[in-house]
Amino acid sequence: MDHLAHHYHAHIAELNRRVAEIVSREALSGLVIHSGQPHRMFLDDINYPFKANPHFKAWLPVLDNPNCWLVVNGRDKPQLIFYRPVDFWHKVSDVPEMFWTEHFEIKLLTKADKVAELLPSDITNWAYLGEHLDVAEVLGFTSRNPDSVMSYLHFHRTTKTEYELECMRRANQIAVQGHLAAKNAFYNGASEFEIQQQYLSAVGQGENEVPYGNIIALNQNAAILHYTALEHQNPARRLSFLIDAGASYFGYASDITRTYAFEKNRFDELITAMNKAQLELIDMMRPGVRYPDLHLATHGKVAQMLLDFELATGDAQGLVDQGITSAFFPHGLGHMLGLQVHDVGGFSFDERGTHIPAPEAHPFLRCTRILAPNQVLTMEPGLYIIDTLLNELKQDSRGQQINWRTVDELRPFGGIRIEDNVIVHQDRNENMTRELGLA
């Protein structure tokens, strides 16, 4: 933890620098950042799992306590208004005593509706950052999530501090242990539900603590891109396993995917080819490279796989130009990663929020940035047998280029995705996922 504490000092200094710059530019007194409030289920007395405002958890790892506030201006010591009610029904968060607390002036809030007593006396020139605009209005904030401030913060959030990079390494390290446990469970005959339990046990995190709903897909379920159902019964025949699952560390996410074949067969060879292509694409990452160019290069590699494995005929570029590869690889190559799984800033050209749109032929690409040092991105090429997309090819002449017999043979396996989390450095790439032990 000492190593992390050392980096945290510089992290807070950088966040203060960013705040000082943007509040000066916008003639604001400062920012008031709300952790959030509980959300009550309709007609019930149970709350949905609480998720802290990412702008709040960028400053400190308070992840599970609603009704907290940060008051920052970039000059004075940041103030943390920490919610600690008198409550005999629920567990009350302890007053924090960790390495980061020395960087904050901490005030305790016992009643959420009394926060005005602890906020600046005149907040008309302070900007509110958070989800609950109705609360901000009642409190008297006239500036609520101003576009200029949000765009500035989102643009700079793509450049990670050393503290953030270390948190993300640890999030990867934790997730790798879960992936190894899940792989072992698959080969030992576990169901999707049982694999999920093995994964969560290995990472030591509950379903509401991991950064997103795990995808645990056996056989044809792997063709459903965001499959989060968990079948309790095993399929009649075990063919394949796709797992897309991450872990959290101090609010930072990992996002890792692997695909396995139960037996050595053609599908297993296709996984090997995809793994090779993915590593080649990662080798192409460097500062100055346009991420959309990497995405287009992925389509070239997918096209070659379609030819090599006799899924399609023609030439590779023609398969890309006609949109045939998009039927087999319909999603983007990857995205920014950080406090959020699909982290902000992926389309920002500058700190004013100028938008870089995805290519017209690839609308699902989640990042269009030019790569720069200390950015963290996922690299997740895939190839799937998705009937709804392939059926569109049957409607025109493109269907004549598809070897439907091979498609039928591979359909029961669902699909393939391989995803690593990569830090772009000035002179190299750091593939956290591989370097921390997941082949």
From Swiss-Prot:
Q: Which UniProt keywords apply?
A: Dipeptidase, Hydrolase, Manganese, Metal-binding, Metalloprotease, Protease
> Got any disulfides in this one, which pairs?
none
Superkingdom of this protein's organism = Bacteria
Give binding positions for Mn(2+) 1. Answer: D255, H335, E380, E419
CDD domains named in the record: Prolidase
* A GO MF term: proline dipeptidase activity
Checking SUPFAM superfamilies in the record gives:
Creatinase/aminopeptidase (SSF55920), Creatinase/prolidase N-terminal domain (SSF53092)
Q: How is the cofactor bound?
A: Binds 2 manganese ions per subunit.
Catalyses which reaction? Xaa-L-Pro dipeptide + H2O = an L-alpha-amino acid + L-proline
Picking any one GO biological process from the record gives:
proteolysis
Q: Does the record's keyword annotation contain Thylakoid?
A: no
One GO CC term, this protein: cytosol
* Binding annotation for Mn(2+) 2: D244, D255, E419
Q: Which residues cross the membrane?
A: none
Enzyme Commission number, as recorded: 3.4.13.9
What cofactor does its activity depend on? Mn(2+)
Q: Which PROSITE patterns match?
A: PROLINE_PEPTIDASE
**Entry keyword Zinc:** no
The UniProt entry, under InterPro entries, shows: Creatin/AminoP/Spt16_N, Creatinase/aminopeptidase-like, PepQ_N, Pept_M24, Peptidase_M24B_aminopep-P_CS, X-Pro_dipept-like, X_Pro_dipept
Which HAMAP family does this entry report, sorted A to Z?
Answer: X_Pro_dipeptid
Family as reported in the entry's similarity comment: Belongs to the peptidase M24B family. Bacterial-type prolidase subfamily.
What's this protein's function?
Splits dipeptides with a prolyl residue in the C-terminal position.
What protein am I looking at?
Xaa-Pro dipeptidase
Q: Which organism is it from?
A: Shewanella sp. (strain ANA-3)
